[in-house]
Amino acid sequence: VGSILEENGVDVYYTRTTDIYESPYQKAQEGNEVGGDYFVSIHRNSSPYPNQYSGVESLVYNRYGAAARMAYNINAGLEQVGFVNLGVNERPNLVVLNSTNMPAVLVEVGFINTDADNELFDSRFDEIARAIADGILESI
C-alpha cells in the first residue's frame, strides 16, 4: 500500500516495518510527531471461532468527516476485490483512533481465522493493496 501511495506522490511514514510490537499509543504518537495528514492502520480481524465471520470492516472515531469518507472508499474497493463489506463502524475507544491528531482509519482486511478470507487475501494480495491505496487516494 505504501509503495503505491509513494508512486502517486504521497509521503508515507511507517510506524512499523518489522514484526516488532509497538503499542497502539506508540503508533498514534509517532503519527502525531511526524505531523501526518491521515493515519491508516491495516490489520487482519479475528473471531472467537474459526470461520465464524468473513469480510472487511473499517473502524473510525465517528462516522462523519474525512476518516469516514476514506473508510467507506477503502471498503468499497475491498468489496470489489471480493470481500464481504461489513461496513464502517465507530470505535471511539481505540487508541489509534482517539489519540491521533489527524483523521484515522483502522482497516480490518478479512478474518485471519476464516479460510475464505485467507484464500482471498493470499490469491489477490496485490489487488487488495491497490484497493486500499486507491481508497486513500480518492479521499485525500
Regions found by a protein language model. Give the residues of each.
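Active-site-proximal helix/loop segments of hydrolytic enzymes
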Residues: V1-I140
